[in-house]
C-alpha cells in the first residue's frame, strides 16, 4: 500500500474543497511550515508554493506614533508561536514575507467534540486561519476572495481538516 503523504492529505482534504487557496502544516515546536500545498498561479510560471509560507528572517522598518523609525527582525515561525502564547499579534502576522492583520483569536473553540485555538488574520482580498491542532501540528490555510473563497467557509474547511487530522493522528493513520 502506498504511503499517504502530508502533501496528499492537504491536497485531498483541503485544497480539493476549493474553500482555500493554500494550506500548510507547521510544527508547534518552532512554528515553521514543513509541508504545504497551493493552487498553481497560471499567470506566474515560476510560482513556488513555498513562497507563500516561508521566508528567511528579514528586517522591516516600523514607524512609531512620533514618526521615529526603527528596524524589527521578523522571524515568521516565532511570530506564530508568540501569537498563540499571548493571544494577539499587535504587529500582525508575517508569512512568506506578506503581512496579515491579526483579527482575533478563538481559544478553545469547540468543533464537533474537539477544542482548537484558532487565529484569524486578513489582508487585502483574502486572509488566513491558523489553527493549533494538537499532536504537534499547526494548520495554516490561506483564502483568496478573488477565487470566490471567504473567511467563513475557509475556516469551516480548516476546522473539518483539523478534526480529521487530530483523529487520524490519535489512531496513527496520518
UniProtKB/Swiss-Prot annotation:
GO cellular component terms listed in the entry, alphabetical order: actin cytoskeleton; cytoplasm
Region (Actin-binding): 99-111, 151-155
Site (Interaction with Pro-rich sequence): 34
Pfam families the record matches: Profilin
Keyword set, alphabetical order: Actin-binding, Cytoplasm, Cytoskeleton, Lipid-binding
Motif mapping: Plasmodium-specific profilin mini-domain: 47-53
Region (Pro-rich sequence-binding): 4-9
Main location: cytoplasm
Entries under InterPro entries matching the protein: PFN (IPR048278), PFN_sf (IPR036140), Profilin_apicomplexa (IPR016814)
Any one GO BP annotation for this protein: actin cytoskeleton organization
Localization, UniProt: Cytoplasm, Cytoskeleton
Residue(s) at site: Interaction with actin: 88
Disulfide bonds: none
GO molecular function, one term: phospholipid binding
Annotated family: Belongs to the profilin family.
Subunit architecture: Binds actin.
Function noted in UniProt: Essential for the invasive blood stages of the parasite. Binds to proline rich sequences in various regulatory formin-like proteins and also to membrane phospholipids. Binds to actin and affects the structure of the cytoskeleton. Weakly sequesters actin monomers.
Domains as described in the record: The actin binding residues are poorly conserved between Plasmodium and other organisms. The Plasmodium-specific profilin mini-domain may have a role in binding to membrane phospholipids.
Protein's recorded name: Profilin
Annotated source species: Plasmodium berghei
Classification of source organism: Eukaryota, Sar, Alveolata, Apicomplexa, Aconoidasida
